[in-house]
A protein has these predicted regions:
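Membrane-interface segments at transmembrane-helix boundaries
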Residues: 23-27, 114-141, 173-189
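Short, solvent-exposed mixed-charge patches
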Residues: 232-234
């Protein structure tokens, strides 16, 4: 077995790692030392993190559609949706080409928002990391795990494993915040889970209130559109 050479932290002699090396280490060797090493190696950039999230989301969506074609009503999309998509391969390809890139864009936005809020809170609590480092680490584990969950969702009897995978992802998020910002577990949990969850709850509450206020108006608009679509042209 070949031993990898060790380099002092921050050394410029450490080589940049390929995406496969980074993903594998981030998912299978989650320690503070590992994450700090990944975050301080050459090649760390927000651009690379965004590419990973886009590619991971695209692949995950493609796997989901393939699952619909292979397993039909047993897939996560349900029997009616599965029958509709599986009945037309051409439609499936068009959906993949048109919608999957949009999912990749939303994945990037989600990474930017999550890493941005978590890092802002971490800095306020005395963290020393950067947004780029945190986004890079999060993308390094989130992209492959997203692909994994899509694979698990293809098989009904295995899809139940998505729950422990989700819990594991939450742990990796806390570990990423702690490793990048070099502070305690308590501050890491506060930065990555508690305050972020509070913000999301506030946003959800605001959305619910807005929808409740605008619900009747939105319903009337859709009702008029449906009526116009059902009315034959003169």
């Amino acid at each position: 077995m070949t031993m990898q050479p060790s380099y002092p932290e921050g050394s410029t002699d450490r080589p940049a790692q390929s995406w496969t090396e980074v993903w594998l280490r981030a998912v299978t060797r989650p320690t503070v030392a590992t994450y700090q090493d990944i975050a301080t190696r050459p090649g760390v950039s927000s651009r690379r993190a965004y590419i990973w999230m886009f590619a991971g989301s695209f692949i995950a969506y493609a796997i989901t559609l393939i699952g619909v074609l292979l397993f039909g009503g047993s897939s996560i999309l349900g029997q009616q949706e599965a029958a509709r998509i599986a009945s037309d391969l051409g439609t499936t390809i068009v959906v993949l080409i048109c919608i999957a890139p949009l999912g990749g864009v939303f994945a990037i936005l989600g990474l930017m928002i999550t890493a941005g809020i978590s890092q802002a809170i971490a800095r306020a609590l005395g963290g020393t990391g950067t947004f780029t480092q945190l986004a890079y680490i999060i993308a390094a584990y989130l992209a492959p795990i997203g692909i994994l969950t899509s694979l698990l969702a293809m098989v009904p009897f295995v899809s139940c494993l998505n729950l422990p995978v989700g819990i594991y992802s939450l742990f990796l998020n806390i570990l990423a915040v702690k490793s990048v910002n070099r502070f305690s577990w308590g501050k890491a949990i506060l930065s990555s889970v508690v305050i972020l969850a509070g913000i999301l709850l506030v946003v959800a509450f605001v959305v619910i209130v807005v929808l409740a206020l605008l619900g009747p108006a939105i319903g009337n608009v859709f009702s008029n559109i449906i009526q116009e679509m059902g009315t034959p042209a003169p």
